[in-house]
């Protein structure tokens, strides 16, 4: 079995505007728990096993505004090493998420497209 897409993330220079746009356009709902620092968890209304997502601020020193897919992997370091061997690069090294929600990393494919990893 392949590695499934587990999460989408929309980053914006104006996350409030992005949240309003996407929730109104697609009839999604959003919740921004205080412990997530303004990051909005999105409920698309799809079944629980569907891909979930969030909307957050773009990092001026990191990822540009855009849409990022997160792929579930067993080993972040091994996947990043494999990506680099295939011509990709590491954009964000493995980083632990709050509340025991696993860890993430972000790679760039050979064309420069960002792809999130979640373990």
Question: What role is predicted for each listed range?
Answer:
Residues 28-64, 114-119:
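Conserved short beta-strand elements that form part of the metal-binding/catalytic scaffold
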